[in-house]
Amino acid sequence: MHVPDHDTLLTEGVIAKFLRYVQIDSPSDEDSTHAPSTTDQWEIARLLEGELLALGLRDARVDAHAIVTATLPGNVPDAPTVGLLAHFDTFPGTPGRGVKPLIHQGYPGDTIALPSGATLSTVSHPELVHCLGHDIITSDGTTLLGADDKAGVAEIMETLCRLLRDPGLKHGPVRVAFTPDEEIGKGVDHFDVPTFGAVAAYTFDGGAQGEVEAENFNATNLRVTLTGRSAHTGYAKGAMVNALHLAGELMSAIPSTMRPETTQDFEGFLHVDEIAGNVESVTLKMLLRDFTEAGLAHKRAMLEGILTGLQQRHPGCQAKLEVTGGYRNMKVEVDRDPRVMGLALKAVRDAGVAPVQRPIRGGTDGARLSFLGLPTPNLFTGGVNHHSRTEWASVQWMEKAVEVGVRLVQLWAGERLATTAAPRKDTGSFPIASA
């Protein structure tokens, strides 16, 4: 894709950037063993590198794993370096190729009808109540929009542009990073925290206006393999052990009050995310989530108990449990430096927005970065209903996110450079193991 010139980038605004980015296909692929997981992601990575170079950020580069980094030098001596991060991959579980963005100007409060036949209303999307008169961006309803997280990418790029346009805005060094594969939990697998060199960072990867998030799930991703015994269906009595039925028993044993569709706020869950197999063998991909490590351990013990019961009730059944990944709650790391959240909350207030602190019922690149010694809470982008064909974003909320970004780096410019702890080896992830 053509790289806009310096003057265009400085003047076009955040929405022009966003519309350009969402029309570049960049879904990730959880089954891939490559980094990045899809070749599509290289196009937007190289475009962003080109745009950063066009803006005059001379150290802009995309590395061998499609991580894009650059530095905006500071104009205040001895100010600490702050980082701004977003990811450019999109969720692979919803169609994300060929996005056709639409702008619905001056939302009047009624139902928004998309060309696909899908609709958005204040009933199905209560956040729209706060967006009367706003310009709302959607896809045509056949794909997701990609506000998660190309809204964050566009907002960080526009933050840089505003700082460049107005030399009177005082700031220290600003490091930016755009990462691939966040949606599959691999966004910072190859991220070099010491080289990045920031004392704190912020992911722009949140939702509705005002959200400031410094607490996320503890997470374990699991692969459960149930092995049965196949037999001729006409002579199966006493011989067949149907792995499909075993999987049904497993799913039925998960308490109905402990599922994603029945939990909220600080409640954790067990979730069957994917299932495949036949009579002889079934594989289930499962997600365990809780805000405390004790709660997560309890859920794992519960699942292990269910599997033990299956094997006892069905001689010939075998159950294997493997941990395939996970992450931990970053709150303990973010809280080590009160400035990290304190300045974020002040930046939101200074932009005329009331901060909304709530737990992230998911994970971000920031969760793992925090355990590597780079405290990284999450800020709103103005995008809502992520991972859906009815994903949408408010233009006005996106513009507020840019205001917050600009104000945030100004506030950090007033801080004194301090010695920071050495980066940790703890990745915040659970090791691959089997049970």
Residue ranges and their predicted role:
Residues P4-I136:
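Acidic/His- and Gly-rich active-site-bordering loop/insert found
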Residues P115-D135, E213-L226, K346, P377:
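Acidic-glycine-rich active-site phosphate/pyrophosphate-binding loop
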Residues A201-A236, M240-L246:
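Phosphate/diphosphate-binding glycine-rich loops and adjacent basic-rich segments that engage nucleotide
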Residues T90, T143, S230-A231, L288-L296:
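A generic structural motif
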Residues L128-T143, T227-A231, A351-G352, G383-H387:
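Glycine/charged-rich beta-loop-alpha catalytic/anionic-binding loops adjacent to active sites
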Residues V129-F217, S256-D273, G277, L284-F291, ...:
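Acidic/histidine-rich catalytic neighborhood of metal-dependent amide-processing enzymes
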Residues P4, T138-A147, S230-K237, S388, ...:
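A short glycine/serine-rich beta->alpha loop
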Residues H2, L244-A435:
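Metal-dependent amide/peptide-bond hydrolase catalytic core
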